[in-house]
């Protein structure tokens, strides 16, 4: 018959079907086409055609089930058919479908034949029966029938029903019915799975049986009743007929079953089955536990000399072959059962092999399976005996065994050992290591398959262990290592020492421990190597660095152990290397400035080695020091030995005596001189050269400090203590406020730390600094010790302290020393101390508490994770870690603290170039010593932080060093990092607690912004920080909230008395700053001011880390600290935001760092005014509070009246040429009070402090309120809901509400909190940023390309990046949603709380242009935005400003720009105006949509807006974008992703933005509306925006108030959670407007929209949101992206796009703006062009490509002029994003 289909193609199709079925999938047409096209390259269309033809041919079966077509191989229809097409004759095809040949088959006969042939004791499974039958050559015609398997199953089932077969589980056995000699047991269930089968022996078969006696000889019962009165079969003796119950005979069920099948004899009649002599030597007869046959012990095979213990099975039952045991037999059965590839049911290899007798066939069957050996084996098997095949009782044939032996011998040869492993007691007994073959001394816990080998092969460089020489040789060719994986810290001649971090090189260190255990008796550490540093000594030649030995030490050891384990390889022993390593460990201890000691207890060998070393060291010391007064302390200082060890050694040398109640050291000159003579005659082979050490300790202890230095330290300590008292007071207040986040003591200690460093500057050196405190205490000790007098003869030294100590082996002294060392002053980070010294030493103590972390016990540890880490001072160690002593250690080991990772990061950062910059800035930080200087420094710090963020690339190193830091509180660590690094995400944590006052959010945003600025390099850090921040953010947020809360109380009363408010805050800030200072000082001491900024960041990060860690446990303690941290970060953030904006504006790219400073100053100046303003209003009005915390926030939060008032302020700010100034103004408002104090300190301090204070205030204010209400995500969500409520209720009142009300709103609704953020955003970012952005972004705006790159760079590198509204906003967004999932939940609230997100968006929301256009708009908004498009934006801005965005108009607009809006940034760029116009036009369009004011319902309001808007365009198409659908996790994930890819961030954000745009679009649209709505919100100040905007006054006002910034944020992050419908609404709402807005604001606006939904304002945000969103994205750089992405989270795709958009710097936002404009398609297009250029410039090509992608989602979601928007949005959003990004 002619086939229609090509037979080759049919074969391919059948193969594909089999392949698909093997993968347990349904062979659908699509899968088949795909499989064939991938494997054979045939195009799918052809495959599809051939498949249809094959079906017509009948070559393929088509099966339709439930409307789905599947295809089957007619020859292999079932899953178990084992015949593969082509394996057997094609006869199968003819038999296809015809079962005629199966009708005459006797299935019972076949089944019985198979079961008996298989002879499986427990019965045979159907599968094995089938295999067996298929292997029978005479049954091929039957078995090849396709229906064979099915019919066989049916036959087996029927046979069981008929009683012919017995079924036990899956096993079938023949039911012989009577005991006729067949071996199959009758009672299958009783047959033991473990006992071998039994069968009659030849001589037993025809024996007569006696009639059974029906009574049990034991219990006299019958078969109806045994001893337990239960029926039981009787066993009867075949010879005498006496019977017994199995239970009476104590037979187990298995034995009973076997016995019933045999000829059983009772014990009297038992005959030996071997010799068959009855009654002979019955005492020596054994009874088989399987068949109960009897055997004489001498008749057994092999004969037995004594009775075996336990179960005994006779040779008859036992498998005969090779004496294989029962269990082996069982294993063989299992092997046999699974020998065939079950994975390939279609070709049962063994069966096929058995059926195919030719060698060729066998080989074919075996193709691809096993080695030729196996194939041959199978051939032999087949040819030798078919019967053997599947079911031999013995299963293993001779051939099998031979092959096995052969293979075993080969394998032994390969691993070069005899076939037996001699039992040497050590595993492995020999290792080959390099050119040495070394006998091991002890066993080591290598994996079993390696340890049991007689010889193990180790790579001498990477220490990997291998089984054979071959593997080693292969490995050595590939192994690229020639030295340990670490920094070389010592090199002299051919000796090097490497410092390997167990956390970074885990595998190497584990292998090193396993190797060491081979030569150490007592060693317990093998796998948990992360907390240890390994100092590996190598001998170097041309081949590499060969391992000589090593010692390990804990990074953070409470007991100051400097060695935990030490080992020298046997081939290098007795060459002085042990002494070398011991000496090296003490050298490190001396460098750390603290005494060290080996870990106790010592092993015998260790004791001998150490005692010899100690004796020589002390004798040499005494030889060189002939002073009359020799104290143990002096010896300790000189040698690094701990006093206890010195005392012990002196006792051993008999050189210590008790005289006159005191201890004296006796000089035994003979001993000393003899020792020195020996030394001269036999000089040491490998002497340690201290000058060759290139290593900086993390901790510097006081031991090495001179007396003067010690005195200085003492003085510093006293100062610190004083400061501590102040701090205590402050802390108590703050901690009370802070919900007892941190115990005052802890804060105190922190501050003390800071102070102590301050004081220490007196000492003047880093090392000395540390020692300052330590030495102060030590000094006292020493003074006591100095009292010791030495006799000239036996110069005796009396140590009053040491008298008792000495006797107690100086335990007391040791304790004293430890205390000293651990004492915070002592421990105060040496580096921090040093840095402080380097800095102008301002005795002015940090305002209330000196942050001195007093966990000195930790400090004791000197941990230098990496040399790099060591090199870096602990900028924020003090601040970050509560315990100074942990500093070095903390940094490395206490990463767990979360602080430490940051510290490390800081260290590593600090070394970077940024450090230089930061150093310059750090100089300001030097001022930190004083409260005012601290503030100054804080400003610098924030700048530095930004820069540090940039520097963070180095810190990233630290991260690398602490990949496992994650374990150690990575989250916290990351959080800290984020904070320090200016992670927006981190800062955004507050949004998580949306209710945090917007100020707080703003501050955080700013901080994040600043961090973000720094974060271009730190992006990876940011990513990590984001991850950490995700965990941390919520905590941070809570902390901040709490912090804010306390500050808020301060602020409320103190706002009017700025100084009062500022003072507590300032104090906190000062403390925070002090921490920063200390960190900075430390960094400076480290020698890098940059370190300082990094340090500040680190500190911030670390503190956040600590804070989160402590937060719950030590909330009281931490609260203040956290407050300080928060404040500091906040301030920094604020400042950073301002700086960033200023910087960006002033020098978008080039002067990022300098500009930030200038900006900072500008901002500070402005901020002082602004902060003051903000601070004052802050307490009075939510607006002000927000202002304080965040200008945007203030605006958003402020009630309409405040908004109205603030807008004036904001306009002032706007009018202020630089957005920085605007932000500054706002910052000043917030900061002014703080600034006043700062002013007291230094101008620089004031600058930074103003922001810090502002941030702190906002944080505290918000925190106080939010603290209560929004400590948890739940609270945050509640806040969101409240926001929604506020949206309706708070429309006008919200603005009107006092700060407290707003804050309450914050509490209840994130909106309020967002407001603060928007205010801050606006103020910090927008306001300052606008000018800065305009300057920086001026380029961006006009030529996106030009700006793109620089701007993007700036965005990433310069504070501006963070500064842009985006940064704040995005930080918040990212923080909330992205950095922390918790935050995201909160973010949901936050997102939903325009308040939270709108800190960025807020400005945007109200002043759509303001936020979106914020940078440009906001500024432009008031001025240029006002122009056509701008007009709307301005209106929106004004509305924003007047409404919740009060700040927006005046502050918000520019601030928004400055802080949050990349778009704003973009807009800020002069051309931005047009963009703004475009946006504005959108805003204008939005104006009508804004009428959707009725949207008051959060979600509904938005929808209403959108519906109204959309009624014309998208009216019906509200696509509820499942904003909320995005889980926080997803958001976080997205955020992380964004963070991970900063560049992609722009695009991603854009795309996501757009995608979300769809959903966000709606929200954005809504946001636009909301902005219009916000106008209503703004109603108090708001009609200004637009009547249309006002439509959802209710919605708008609350959302507006908080939402604008928060909205944007929330929208960005919250869009996810925000109303889907709302999003859709946005999309729908005003086709042009919404669409445009959506795209424009989509990212942030999405959040805004959500906010909008939640708050009418949110919609307002939409337009502004875009700018802001852009800003946010841009500011977020990473974080913003994430946030916006989260906003877009609503649509996962969108979210991704958002992420891209966010990366683009709010690409979405701009598109949203476009959306806004897109009502004006021209604008939209224009925007896209502009954004496109910008984006392209910024992101390179990505921007646009992504944007288009984004556009589709955007367009999709929006369905609003998707084309325009898509592109427009894409272009515009991207542009904005890019612009903001670039800035960043």
From Swiss-Prot:
- Covalent cross-link Glycyl lysine isopeptide (Lys-Gly) (interchain with G-Cter in SUMO2), where: 381
Residue ranges of domain H15 in the record = 103-176
Q: Which controlled-vocabulary keywords does the entry list?
A: Acetylation, Activator, Acyltransferase, Chromatin regulator, Isopeptide bond, Metal-binding, Nucleus, Phosphoprotein, Repeat, Repressor, Transcription, Transcription regulation, Transferase, Ubl conjugation, Zinc, Zinc-finger
The annotated region (Interaction with BRPF1) lies at 460-716
State the EC number(s).
Answer: 2.3.1.48
Here the segments flagged for biased composition (Basic and acidic residues) are 938-957, 1055-1064, 1088-1101, 1107-1118, 1144-1163, 1224-1240
**Record note on modification:** Autoacetylation at Lys-523 is required for proper function.
Where do the MYST-type HAT domain residues begin and end? Answer: 423-697
Compositionally skewed regions (Acidic residues) per UniProt: 777-819, 1065-1087, 1119-1128, 1209-1218
List the subcellular locations: Nucleus
Composition-biased stretches (Basic residues)? 835-854, 904-914
Where do the segments described as Disordered lie?
72-98, 730-884, 904-1163, 1195-1273, 1291-1330
Modified positions (Phosphoserine) in chain numbering: 355, 756
Q: Where is the composition biased (Low complexity)?
A: 856-869, 1305-1322
Q: Which InterPro entries match?
A: Acyl_CoA_acyltransferase, ARM-type_fold, HAT_MYST-type, Histone_H1/H5_H15, MYST_HAT, SAMD1-like_WH, WH-like_DNA-bd_sf, WH_DNA-bd_sf
UniProt remark on domains: The N-terminus is involved in transcriptional activation while the C-terminus is involved in transcriptional repression.
Function recorded in the entry: Histone acetyltransferase which may be involved in both positive and negative regulation of transcription. Required for RUNX2-dependent transcriptional activation. May be involved in cerebral cortex development. Component of the MOZ/MORF complex which has a histone H3 acetyltransferase activity.
Checking PANTHER family in the record gives: HISTONE ACETYLTRANSFERASE, HISTONE ACETYLTRANSFERASE KAT6B
Protein name as annotated? Histone acetyltransferase KAT6B
Q: Which organism is it from?
A: Macaca fascicularis (Crab-eating macaque)
Lineage of the native species? Eukaryota, Metazoa, Chordata, Craniata, Vertebrata
Q: Which gene encodes it?
A: KAT6B
